[in-house]
Structure formats: structure tokens, C-alpha cells
């Protein structure tokens, strides 16, 4: 028999001539067919197969003297599927003889569903009764006795929706531990991947669980199945196994988390159980350090996807006893509600590439990412960085303010357009200073342009997220482009430099709001303006432009049909006023779409007048259109805009502190990764500390960050501490006290600081 790891030998299937070889292809809309449905029969369509027709093979002549060998009863797919779905093993009698007589196997296309590739074993597992089906073991034994080179137990679905789905996956989904044991004992591969479209994360109906049987059991909260798959003596599952995306079972658990209390509790329980199981089965493997194809560990994946609850748990996970090395938080000292904790900064600090801080600030698509930066240790870590870089932030603010004052003075004292851009040798002092101002403006524009290009280049892989979230960066880039272009046109003595110059000046003063994020109250005000413009105002303008264009075209069309000056105003009129000498005929009020749009805009802001020229032929229709426009825009759209803006402002105000923290985090990381500052080596926060001993006896050293907390909710819980008092490391005789080793890039004497008075935000 061919081994499970080697590919099966090539063979032609056989046909006894009575099979329905229908190979129709459904060219309509492709939708995932049901794996099992009581309201729909199995699909008979299948891909074309080259088979050997046994009816064309000459049988040996019958020996009249010898007893004749009777041909066994015929088993087709419908009969076999009916038997296994009802769970009647007695009706499988004669199946083995029929397979041998016709050189068939249970994995042949004659015994699989055409649309999905479902086998009779899958059919049996799909129709369990009280978690069992009496036909499963006979099918496995018949398949083994028939000498099938391709084991039935490892047969997989072949269609694009359920590709790779196996009987083991189905047994796990049916939550039958007994069936799982039966399949594994009979050679089921525990590392088969279900990689069809239904099992991939995309829009529409799908269920991504990590493709592997172990991941499916973990994501469906079956700890007994998980334990069996990891500890069975036949083929133990590997915790390091990955799917087609490079995700392990821990990644899969992060992906199915949805931040609800019930789901989070189950995911966290399973996550911790797998970590502890991994520590027992493979103590040398760091499961949380395994990255997928995107370079994301489970912690980084939770940060990118915005899975706040599982992200909080991983950051603040604390174990005691033999599983303490799995912790990322270590209680160093506590007194009542006051607790001093050490947090593991691996993969968190921006000192490392693709850190958690950078992912939250620049690569996270979740609208609630501001809730992650206020979690410990990120909150205190960002505050530590801000305190260190705040002088640089205000230095940049002062330089930009001086630059804008120079820009304003130069723009205000612009000479007439007919004067040369470069003054002659007899130029006055004012003209020389004006030329110097233009040169400084050009240099500043080039500096801003290089800085913004560097910003977007570093985020080129996440360009869509960058454009959606980099409001001020886009404005700075536009300002820099206009500034450089205006100065080039200025030295080329082109008059169009002036409009570009004033546009750049306006953008420059608007961009001054960027530096308000250094203060909480002004920073939140800036965020409110940004959210209102990007969310509410853009939607309002889209609808408003549709109304404006439609009504403008209608008014222009009606204005062309003016009454003849000699025609009477009505039937009773006999005298028509003639224009006097020197008096020109009054033009139509809406001569073009632009004029009509400007007049209609006045109605939108409440400054329009309903008076119109008497020579209009359809005055009633024009009046009706104007009244409808006022109702739709001035009354309806403007009030909807005000209501939406109020809702946005209230939402931002409710989360003002966390949103401001996110703005500060972005500013801190931008200063660390700036065009000039990034040339220096980044500062690493925290210190290298010994927090315990690993299972192999080696010291467990982590780069940790100390955080002082006050927690009245859980202060009665007794946790093991690393120190007996807050005097810091170095106390002789304390075997649990961490011995610190100052690193090259370590923080200043952080470990020796006494406890300070704590202030809640």
C-alpha cells in the first residue's frame, strides 16, 4: 500500500456501463452548494473521467463442469449514500466483493458527489446519530481491505468552495469526539488543510478557522478534541503547523475574536490553554513568536485587526506557578490597591521593526484603535516617549511658526506683477529682503516636500490606510507642492505664481492645527474638525452637488424661453412697454450653468431672492423649481448636516481622552521616524530584567517596562510578587528579586525611582 506521504500511483478508474456519466457544467452564478441538505439531492454532475469499460473486456467462458461464479450485487452512489446516511451497516454486505469484482475503490468519482467531491465517508459523518454512525467503521475496513492506494479517510473535497475539507473536519464540526478518535485511529491526517473559498476570510458568507483540524477544534471551543489531537499516540497534531496564510492556531483564535464578552471569554480560555499545553509538550518552542506570511505574531495580528479584548489579555497576561514564563506581566510589588508591574516590551516598543505601536498608529483599520493606546503598558510607554520628545515637538512648532510668519510677510508685500523677480544691483533693502524671503520659502517648501514624500514612502504598502488616516500629511504635501511650484513660477516671472502662492499660504495656516495635538483640549477640537470634514461634510457635498447641477440645468433651459418684448403680458394687456432710447434690454437671469449655480448657492445659505425678470415665459415653473430647491437644500440638507455633525462631535467628545492619546502616539512615532531623526539609533525604553527561571533552568530575562497602577476592583486578589518592597533590585537574599542588567540603550535610572503619587487620567 502506498504511504500517506507519497503520491498515489496513476490508475484508470473502471466502469461497469450502468453509471450515469453526466458532465454538465453549470455556467450560471456560482454559489457555495450545501455540504448536506435534506431538501436537495446529491449532484450527479462530475468532471469528465477516462475509464475502462468492463463490458468491452471479454470474460473467460463459463466452465460447465465447475460451479459458476455469480456476479455480486451492484452498488452505485445513490444506494451507498442512502445506506450510510441511514446508518445501516447490514446493507453494506457485498460491497467489498463488488468493488473487487469491478476493480473499484470508494474514492473513485463514481462514489463521490459531483459538485463538492463528497465521499461516502463524509456522508456518513454528516449524518451522525447521537455522535456516532455505525457505517463509519465498516466503510474504513472495506476501504482498507480493497487495497485502495488513496485512503478514504484522507479523501478531501475538490470544489473551489470546500476544497481540502475532509471527514476529520466534518467530525470536529459535528462535535463528536468518538468519531474523531475513530478516524484518527484509522490513519486520518491531522494536518489536512481546508482551503476552499468558504474557509477563507472574504466578504460574504464564510468561516475562517485556520484550515487545520486543530484550529477548527479550537475555534469551535472543543477543548476535549484539542487535547486528543495534541496527545493521541497515532499522529499528534503540531502547534507549530500553519495554514496557507502562515497562521497558527493562535492566529486563528485571534481572527475569530469579536470583542464581545462571551466570545472574548471563550477565546481567551482556549488561547491560554493552548499556551500551557505547548509549554508541556514542546517547552523549547515559543508559540507566540511564530509569524505568519505578513510578519505578524498573534499579538501584532490582534493589534492590526483591532481585536481589543484578546489584545488586552495578551499584553496583560499573568500566570503563576510553573507557567509563569508564559506571562507578559509580572507583579513586582503591591500594597493594597497600589501595584507595581513589569510589562514585557518584546514586539511592543517602536525600537523594534514592525512593532505593535507602529501597527496601531499607521496600519490598523479598526475605528476603535484609540481604545488600544490607553491600555497598559502602551499608555505609560507613550507618555514616557512623549516626555522625552516633547521638546523636539515644540521646537518643530516654533520653526514652523517662524516659517509661516516669513511666508505671510513676503506674501503681504508682494510687488506688482510687472516688476522683475530678481531685483537689479541697485535694489533697495526691502527688495533684497523680499528676495531672501522667497528663497527661504522655497527651501522650506522643499524640506516639507521631502518630509511628506518620506512619510508616504514608508507607508507605501498601506497606502490606502495612509490616505484615509493622514489628513494633515496630505495637506502638508499639497502645501509643499504649491509652495515649490509658486516659487519656481515666481523666478520664471510668470504671473500665475501669485494664485498658487496665496493658496499655499492659506493651507499653511490651516496646517498649524496639526500642532494643537500637543494639548488635550485643542487637539480634540482639531480631531472634531477633521472627522466632520471627512465624514459628514463630504457626504453632504456629494448630495448637494447632485441637486445643484440638476436645478441649475433646469433653470438655464427655462431662461432661454423669454417672452418677446412686444408681446402683451396677458390677454387683457393692450399696451407693451418699449425700451427707451439708451436703455438696453435686461439680460436673462440664468444665462449659464455657472451663473445659475451661484444664484442657487445664495438660496442655500439663505441670501437668495425669489424675484425674477418679467420677461420669463414660464414664471410659474421657475418659481416652483426655486421653492423645491429651497426646501430640499436650505431646509432638508442643511439640517441633516447639522444633525450629523452634532452626532460626530458627541462621539468624539465621549472618547476625547483616548483619541487625543492616539494623536500623541502618531506624533511620537513620526518624530522617531522623521527624515532626519531616523538616522539616529532609536532610544529603547525599559530595562533588561530577570523575571524568573525557564523550564530548562536558564534565567528568564526580559526587556521590561515598570508601570505603577491603582486598581480598586482587583486589589484583594493575592498574586505572587517578585519583590517584598519597592526599594528596587539589588536587595541581598531576596531570591525572587529580579537582577537588572543595564543595557546599552536602557532608560535612565528607572529601576531606582521611588513610588510617586499616582494620578488617574
Curated annotation (Swiss-Prot):
The modification Phosphoserine is found at residues 6, 15, 82, 748, 760. The gene is Trpv2. GO terms for molecular function: calcium channel activity; identical protein binding; monoatomic cation channel activity. It is a multi-pass membrane protein. N-glycosylated. The keyword Metal-binding does not apply. Residues 414-433, 482-495 are extracellular. This is Transient receptor potential cation channel subfamily V member 2. Homotetramer. Interacts with a cAMP-dependent protein kinase type II regulatory subunit (PRKAR2A or PRKAR2B) and ACBD3. Interacts with SLC50A1; the interaction probably occurs intracellularly and depends on TRPV2 N-glycosylation. The keyword Transcription does not apply. It holds the Pfam family Ank_2. Keywords: ANK repeat, Calcium, Calcium channel, Calcium transport, Cell membrane, Cytoplasm, Glycoprotein, Ion channel, Ion transport, Membrane, Phosphoprotein, Repeat, Transmembrane, Transmembrane helix, Transport. Residues 1-49, 56-75, 564-587, 720-761 are annotated as: Disordered. Calcium-permeable, non-selective cation channel with an outward rectification. Seems to be regulated, at least in part, by growth factors, like IGF1, PDGF and morphogenetic neuropeptide/head activator. May transduce physical stimuli in mast cells. Activated by temperatures higher than 52 degrees Celsius; is not activated by vanilloids and acidic pH. Residues 1-392, 455-460, 517-537, 643-761 are cytoplasmic. It catalyses: Ca(2+)(in) = Ca(2+)(out); Mg(2+)(in) = Mg(2+)(out); Na(+)(in) = Na(+)(out); K(+)(in) = K(+)(out). Residues 1-390 are annotated as: Required for interaction with SLC50A1. It comes from Rattus norvegicus. Residues 570-581, 734-746 have a biased composition (Polar residues). ANK repeats lie at residues 73-115, 116-162, 163-208, 209-244, 245-293, 294-320. GO terms for biological process: calcium ion import across plasma membrane; negative regulation of cell population proliferation; positive regulation of axon extension; positive regulation of calcium ion import; positive regulation of cold-induced thermogenesis; response to temperature stimulus. Residues 573-609 dip into the membrane without crossing it. InterPro entries: Ankyrin_rpt, Ankyrin_rpt-contain_sf, Ion_trans_dom, TRPV, TrpV1-4. The chain crosses the membrane at residues 393-413, 434-454, 461-481, 496-516, 538-558, 622-642. Gene3D superfamilies: 1.10.287.70, Ankyrin repeat-containing domain. GO terms for cellular component: axon; axonal growth cone; cell body; cell surface; endomembrane system; growth cone membrane; lamellipodium; melanosome.
Amino acid at each position: 500500500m502506498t504511504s500517506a506521504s507519497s503520491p498515489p500511483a496513476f490508475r484508470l478508474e473502471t466502469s461497469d456501463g450502468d453509471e450515469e456519466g453526466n458532465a454538465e457544467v453549470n455556467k450560471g452564478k456560482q454559489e457555495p452548494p450545501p455540504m448536506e441538505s435534506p431538501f436537495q439531492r446529491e449532484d450527479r454532475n462530475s468532471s469528465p473521467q477516462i475509464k475502462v469499460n468492463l463490458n468491452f473486456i471479454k470474460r473467460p467462458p463459463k466452465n460447465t463442469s465447475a460451479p459458476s461464479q455469480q456476479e455480486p450485487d451492484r452498488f452505485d452512489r445513490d444506494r451507498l449514500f442512502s445506506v450510510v446516511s441511514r446508518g445501516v451497516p447490514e446493507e453494506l454486505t457485498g460491497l467489498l466483493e463488488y468493488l473487487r469484482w469491478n476493480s473499484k475503490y470508494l474514492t473513485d468519482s463514481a462514489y463521490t458527489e459531483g459538485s463538492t467531491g463528497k465521499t461516502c465517508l463524509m456522508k456518513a459523518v454528516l449524518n451522525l446519530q447521537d455522535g456516532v454512525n455505525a457505517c463509519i467503521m465498516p466503510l474504513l475496513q472495506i476501504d482498507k481491505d480493497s487495497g485502495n492506494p488513496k485512503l478514504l479517510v484522507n479523501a478531501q473535497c475538490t470544489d473551489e468552495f470546500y476544497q481540502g475539507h475532509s471527514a476529520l473536519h466534518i467530525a470536529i464540526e459535528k462535535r463528536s469526539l468518538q468519531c474523531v478518535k475513530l478516524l484518527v485511529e484509522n490513519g486520518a491526517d491531522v494536518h489536512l488543510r481546508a482551503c476552499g473559498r468558504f474557509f477563507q476570510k472574504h466578504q460574504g458568507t464564510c468561516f475562517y478557522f485556520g484550515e487545520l483540524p486543530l484550529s477548527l477544534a479550537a475555534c469551535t471551543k472543543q477543548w476535549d478534541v484539542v487535547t486528543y489531537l495534541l496527545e493521541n499516540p497515532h499522529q499528534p497534531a503540531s502547534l507549530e503547523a500553519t495554514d496557507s496564510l502562515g497562521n497558527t492556531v493562535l492566529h486563528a483564535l485571534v481572527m475569530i475574536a469579536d470583542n464581545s464578552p462571551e466570545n472574548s471569554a471563550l477565546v481567551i480560555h482556549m488561547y491560554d490553554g493552548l499556551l500551557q499545553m505547548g509549554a508541556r509538550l514542546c517547552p523549547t518552542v515559543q508559540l507566540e513568536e511564530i509569524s505568519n506570511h505578513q510578519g505578524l505574531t498573534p499579538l501584532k495580528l490582534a493589534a492590526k485587526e483591532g481585536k481589543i479584548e484578546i489584545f488586552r489579555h495578551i499584553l496583560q497576561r499573568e500566570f503563576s506557578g510553573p507557567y509563569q514564563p508564559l506571562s507578559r506581566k509580572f507583579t513586582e510589588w503591591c500594597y493594597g490597591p497600589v501595584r507595581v508591574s513589569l510589562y514585557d516590551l518584546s514586539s511592543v516598543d517602536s525600537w523594534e521593526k514592525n512593532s505593535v505601536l507602529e501597527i496601531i498608529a499607521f496600519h490598523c483599520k479598526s475605528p476603535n484603535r484609540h481604545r488600544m493606546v490607553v491600555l497598559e503598558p502602551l499608555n505609560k510607554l507613550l507618555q514616557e516617549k512623549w516626555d522625552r520628545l516633547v521638546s523636539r515637538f515644540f521646537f518643530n512648532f516654533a520653526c514652523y511658526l517662524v516659517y509661516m510668519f516669513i511666508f505671510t510677510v513676503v506674501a503681504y508685500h508682494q510687488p506688482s506683477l510687472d516688476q522683475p523677480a530678481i531685483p537689479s544691483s541697485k535694489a533697495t533693502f526691502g527688495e533684497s529682503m523680499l528676495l531672501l524671503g522667497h528663497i527661504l520659502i522655497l527651501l522650506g517648501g522643499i524640506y516639507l516636500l521631502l518630509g511628506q514624500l518620506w512619510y508616504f514612502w514608508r507607508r507605501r504598502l498601506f497606502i490606502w490606510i495612509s490616505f484615509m488616516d493622514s489628513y494633515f500629511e496630505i495637506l502638508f504635501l499639497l502645501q509643499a507642492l504649491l509652495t515649490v511650484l509658486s516659487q519656481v513660477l515666481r523666478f520664471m516671472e510668470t504671473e500665475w505664481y501669485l494664485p498658487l502662492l496665496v493658496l499655499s499660504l492659506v493651507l499653511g495656516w490651516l496646517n498649524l492645527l496639526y500642532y494643537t495635538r500637543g494639548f488635550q483640549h485643542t487637539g480634540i477640537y482639531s480631531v472634531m474638525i477633521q472627522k466632520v470634514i471627512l465624514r459628514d461634510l463630504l457626504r453632504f457635498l456629494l448630495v448637494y452637488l447632485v441637486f445643484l447641477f440638476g436645478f441649475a440645468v433646469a433653470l438655464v433651459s427655462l431662461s432661454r424661453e423669454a417672452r418677446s418684448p412686444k408681446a402683451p403680458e396677458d390677454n387683457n394687456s393692450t399696451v407693451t412697454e418699449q425700451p427707451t432710447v439708451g436703455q438696453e434690454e435686461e439680460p436673462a437671469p440664468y444665462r449659464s450653468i455657472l451663473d445659475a449655480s451661484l444664484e442657487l448657492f445664495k438660496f442655500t445659505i439663505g441670501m437668495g431672492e425669489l424675484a425674477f425678470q418679467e420677461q420669463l415665459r414660464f414664471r410659474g415653473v421657475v418659481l416652483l423649481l426655486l421653492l423645491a430647491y429651497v426646501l430640499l437644500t436650505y431646509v432638508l440638507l442643511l439640517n441633516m448636516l447639522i444633525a450629523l455633525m452634532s452626532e460626530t462631535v458627541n462621539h468624539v467628545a465621549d472618547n476625547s481622552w483616548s483619541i487625543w492619546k492616539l494623536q500623541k502616539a502618531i506624533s511620537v512615532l513620526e518624530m522617531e521616524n522623521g527624515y532626519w531623526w531616523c538616522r539616529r539609533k532609536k532610544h529603547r525604553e525599559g530595562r533588561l530584567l530577570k523575571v524568573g527561571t525557564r523550564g530548562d533552568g536558564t534565567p528568564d530575562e526580559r526587556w521590561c517596562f515598570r508601570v505603577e497602577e491603582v486598581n480598586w476592583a482587583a486589589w484583594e486578589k493575592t498574586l505572587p510578587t517578585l519583590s517584598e518592597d519597592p526599594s528596587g533590585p539589588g536587595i541581598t537574599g531576596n531570591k525572587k528579586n529580579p537582577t537588572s542588567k543595564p543595557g546599552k540603550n536602557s532608560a535612565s535610572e528607572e529601576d531606582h525611582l521611588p513610588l510617586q503619587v499616582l494620578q488617574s487620567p
